[in-house]
Curated annotation (Swiss-Prot):
Residues 607-775 form the SF3 helicase domain. It comes from the Viruses. PROSITE patterns: SF3_HELICASE_1. This is Putative primase C962R. It comes from African swine fever virus (isolate Tick/South Africa/Pretoriuskop Pr4/1996). InterPro entries: AEP_C962R, Helicase_SF3_DNA-vir, P-loop_NTPase, Phage/plasmid_primase_P4_C, PriCT_2, Viral_Helicase-Primase_Cplx. GO terms for biological process: DNA replication. One of its GO terms (molecular function) is hydrolase activity, acting on acid anhydrides. It holds the Pfam family PriCT_2. The keyword Chaperone does not apply.
């Protein structure tokens, strides 16, 4: 059998002693029922007793103090653990705290002769620093020693409880003792390596432990001996001293108290002092708040040990230190004492504004959601730097939590107790939240080495049932229980009294019955049900995948927030659930698959500016935030590669980030508000959506079109689900073999559309004289599009163009110069929008024109033009006026003084009339466009060219070949 560490014994024994020690039970009854009326607020100057176990403070009168001392003495004699302090008041006894560094690992002898000499030297300084009262007085000295040497460190206390001194007098005595050569010689003879600096200067006023009490996770000091010194003012040179006999017959808690005035052995001796100069010490609430936290919070004890594993750079270097502070603050607001303790590990920084910086960071943590790191990161850092020590601490933490339940409930374990330990074991790996249907849903953070689907690594995987927890309870949890059995059997092997041994026998018997339950299916299901409440993280589902700059990829998480993109293939705290199976690899134009795809893009889109614009546009599909309000309409008669390209984008991004959309979403009337629309819900959270395979002459629903393209919130719902609000974030492409019909003159709709017409056709036997006919390669459709190497390469191309768009155009598609698409879009609009055709053909911008047209004149001119060139029809003037106000003429329309709309700075042309100097057509000119002539390629690497109207690409001697 092995004995657990003292720290484990400390926390477990506190629980156990309440069961088998009647004295401890009586003490708790006294504190909770009778002395509770004397409770004080933390920090109160009335306080004289502090209970470190509960953090409660008391102002006890002398009679109640004696009762408390009696109970504490009985508990001490039974070996109970206690954590009581007394506050040194205005006048109280003297305590000297010696912290020794030894030359060896052996405890110093500290025999009575040496201690007697030390008493004499201390009394000399007392006489010199205070005014002793007249008459004969007995002054008692007690020496309490640290139980053992720890790594060459030792200590002892000198208690002089009867001599009542002011704090300033104590400080004076301590100050002079620090420089006493005789005292230093005595200590040096005892093997002390630091005799000149071993006396703690702060012992004059800090709260002092009552005898038998200790600091958390430390053994109490033990009484070595006591001396009685007699001083008579009539004969000050004769100072006899002798060792106290039968010292254990007294109530030592009472006799060694610095504030007690009613001892049987020790009587108070008051020394005169300047009372006006005295200032009562403050009760150091912060000094013991960490101890209280660790007593009551097992996780805090656990984190304290984990933080101790972090190397110095984590509390010296600001970025790492701030991460630790954020992690503690985001884990629990109660962990401020841990943050302060950790920060004080670097005294230089703490003493130069460290406390103020901590205060600021702690307050910022709740506001800065972008830095939402928690204790999970602390665990990762500790495991990274000290894996073996981390493993030992983690295992010990599980043991302590389980042991507390075993000892508190006499060996009987129920579902919640097991769930609590499982939460400590797996709380960093599993999360539970409630979905929109009110059901508890499990999520598991997937790590390397466990079974998974491609792409799940380093992400939160949704679990129907946490099967790993079921297995873990039976196979791993049993090992923790075996340690409890070992711990109980160890105590049974010790020479305890009969009542204590009987307690451990009953405990072991009950615990063995509980152990077998972890192999029972129904019991484990009960544990899992209770675990749902512990693992619950509210709104966790709502936080998943909310960062638009993060994409789950096959080999981790890709961050596109910075340039270049960063692959996160290690532990992180980003709540990512969705993913694509594609692995991210940096763009490499020399990669054979990348070369193949770059050449294919060159064939599919022969115009360089259009090719670059379309790739920039498609690259925005990897970003799921708000985008520019655009939609690409791609016209092609078939066998031109547009479908291959659109499907490849969708396959690369996967179903979580991309979706093929039903064309009826664009062509049908909008459903009523109360009806579901699953097709529309396919756009929720997607970065990419595409339409294809339309019938001839499909008419687009312009109101739906604007809703889908405009950035902002929309509402819809799935079948049998509640209405949801979400943002439109998809990059959308609509492909067709026929032109869409867009029956609107609204400029707000048209300015959101871009149109491109395919020129190339892939044929079995291409005409060698036709540069727009290319040799078809069925492998692109049947093999390459499914090949992971091809998909990985294309994903790297998308990321490359995304980075290029951010660096060179500030992420704005509209800044990319593309005369081909601009002119084709203009031509397409003219074919659909007769009002726009009229404006661009008959109205010119003329800054020097003096003529001002009433809007009614423009309406008349359009009606005449329409009847002459399109078809004879009856026009409604009011409708035409509204259409003109929403057209491209909007910026030229002004209000006249009589509140009518006028057209200014323009001129309406008559038939066959030409432009005058300084005039220009409104809209994009299609004269001499590149509709039928491909731009020649720049030499070598087309993807490196940046479209710029003032810097045309360097041209090759001839048009590109397939």
């Amino acid at each position: 059998m092995r004995e657990e560490s003292w720290e484990d014994h400390d926390t477990i024994q506190l629980t156990a002693q309440r069961k088998y020690l009647a004295e401890v039970q009586a003490l708790e009854t006294l504190l909770t029922r009778e002395l509770s009326v004397f409770l004080t607020e933390p920090g109160s100057k009335k306080t004289n007793i502090i209970n470190r176990i509960t953090g409660k403070t008391y102002a006890l009168p002398s009679t109640e103090l004696l009762r408390l001392y009696e109970h504490l003495e009985q508990c001490r004699k039974q070996g109970a653990l206690m954590y009581f302090l007394e506050r040194q008041g205005t006048y109280s006894g003297l305590m000297l705290d010696y912290d020794l560094k030894l030359n060896t690992n052996a405890a110093p002898p500290l025999e009575p002769p040496a201690l007697s000499r030390l008493c004499h030297r201390i009394f000399v300084h007392i006489k010199n620093s205070s005014v002793l009262p007249e008459g004969s007085h007995k002054i008692h000295f007690f020496f309490t020693l640290k139980p053992e040497v720890v790594q060459g460190k030792y200590g002892f206390h000198v208690l002089i409880p009867g001599l009542k001194l002011a704090a300033s007098t104590k400080k004076s005595i301590i100050g002079s003792l620090q420089h006493d050569a005789t005292v230093q010689k005595i200590l040096h003879e005892q093997g002390v390596a630091n005799p000149e600096s071993c006396l703690d200067p702060h012992s004059a006023s800090v709260p002092s432990l009552l005898y038998g009490s200790s600091k958390l996770n430390h053994k109490p000091y033990q009484l070595k001996t006591g001396f009685e010194l007699v001083f008579d003012s009539s004969d000050p040179d004769y100072i006899p001293i002798h060792q106290i006999k039968n010292i254990e017959s007294y109530n030592l808690v009472s006799e060694l108290s610095l504030t007690n005035e009613q001892g049987s052995l020790v009587r108070p001796v008051y020394c005169a002092a300047d009372i006006a100069a005295e200032k009562e010490e403050e009760i150091p609430t912060e000094d013991h708040s960490l101890s209280i936290l660790m007593l009551h919070d097992p996780e805090a004890r656990y984190l304290h040990k984990i933080l101790n594993l972090l190397p110095p750079e984590y509390y010296v270097e600001y970025p790492l230190w701030s991460n630790v502070v954020f992690a503690l603050a985001n884990t629990s607001a109660n962990y401020r004492p841990l943050a302060e303790w950790f920060s004080q590990k670097c005294p230089e920084k703490w003493n130069t504004g460290g406390k103020e910086k901590l205060e600021q960071l702690w307050n910022d943590a709740s506001r800065h959601t972008e830095k939402k790191i928690t204790k999970r990161s602390i665990m990762y850092w500790a495991h990274k730097h000290a894996p073996q020590q981390y493993k030992e601490i983690v295992e010990q933490g599980y043991f302590s939590i389980l042991a507390e339940y075993v000892y508190s409930y006499n060996g009987i374990l129920e579902h919640y107790m097991i769930a609590k330990v499982i939460y400590a074991m797996m709380g960093n790996k599993f999360v539970v939240d409630v979905d929109s249907n009110g059901k508890y849903v499990w999520f598991e953070f997937v790590l390397p080495g466990q079974p998974m689907n491609q792409g799940e690594i380093w992400k939160w995987r949704k679990e129907v049932n946490p099967d790993e927890l079921h297995i873990y309870i039976s196979e791993n949890f049993s090992r923790v229980m075996d340690r409890i059995t070992e711990h109980i059997k160890y105590h049974l092997s010790q020479p305890h009294e009969t009542n204590i041994l009987n307690y451990y026998k009953k405990l072991l018997k009950a615990f063995e019955r509980s152990k077998s339950k972890i192999f029972n299916d129904s019991f484990k299901k009960g544990v899992i049900r209770q675990a749902e409440f512990l693992f619950r993280q509210r709104s966790f589902i709502q936080t998943l995948d909310t960062n638009p700059h993060l994409l789950g990829v096959g080999n981790g998480v890709l961050s596109i927030e910075t340039i270049p993109a960063k692959l996160i293939n290690h532990f992180h705290e980003y709540p990512i659930h969705q993913y694509t199976h594609i692995c991210y690899v940096p763009f490499n134009p020399e990669n054979p698959w990348t070369k193949l795809l770059l050449n294919a893009l060159q064939d599919i889109i022969p115009e360089l500016d259009a090719r670059l614009w379309i790739m920039f546009y498609l690259s925005t599909a990897i970003f799921r935030g708000l985008k520019e309000a655009l939609m690409l309409l791609w016209l092609g008669g078939g066998c031109n590669g547009k479908t291959f390209l659109m499907r490849l984008v969708a396959m690369v991004l996967g179903d979580h980030y991309a979706s093929k959309l039903n064309i009826s979403l664009l062509t049908s009337y909008r459903e009523t508000a109360e009806k579901p629309n699953s097709a529309f819900m396919r756009l929720k959270g997607r970065g990419y959506g595409y339409f294809e395979e339309t019938n001839k002459s499909e008419v687009l629903n312009t109101s739906r079109l604007k809703e889908m393209v405009n950035p902002g919130d929309v509402t819809a719902r799935e079948l049998n689900q509640k209405q949801e609000s979400f943002q439109m974030t998809a990059t959308m492409v609509a492909a067709s073999n026929y032109n869409f019909i867009i029956d609107t003159t609204d400029h707000g709709t048209w300015r959101r559309l871009r149109h491109y017409r395919s020129k190339v056709k892939f044929c079995h036997n291409p005409d060698p004289n036709n540069s727009y006919e290319k040799k078809e390669d069925p492998r692109f459709i049947h093999e390459y599009i499914m090949d992971p190497n091809c998909q990985n390469a294309f994903f790297s191309i998308l990321v490359y163009f995304w980075e290029k768009l951010q660096k060179e155009y500030n992420g704005q598609i509209k800044k990319v110069f593309c005369p081909t698409i601009e002119s084709e879009t203009e031509a397409y609009r003219k074919s659909q929008d007769t009002l726009h055709r009229f404006i661009t053909e008959r109205i010119v911008e003329s800054p020097s024109a003096e003529t001002v047209y009433n809007l009614s004149e423009v309406v008349t001119a359009y009606a005449e033009w329409y009847n002459a060139n399109i078809n004879v029809k009856r026009h409604i003037a009011l409708e035409l006026s509204q259409e003109l106000e929403n057209s491209v003429l909007e910026k030229y329309l002004q209000w006249s003084p009589n509140k009518t709309r006028i057209l200014k700075g323009c001129r309406i042309l008559h038939k066959f009339e030409t432009l005058q100097p300084g005039e220009s057509y409104i809209g994009v000119s299609t004269t001499g466009t590149l509709l039928n002539t491909p731009i020649c390629e720049p030499k070598n690497k087309w993807w490196e060219w940046s479209p710029n109207p003032s810097a045309p690409p360097e041209k090759e001697a001839s048009a590109p070949t397939p």
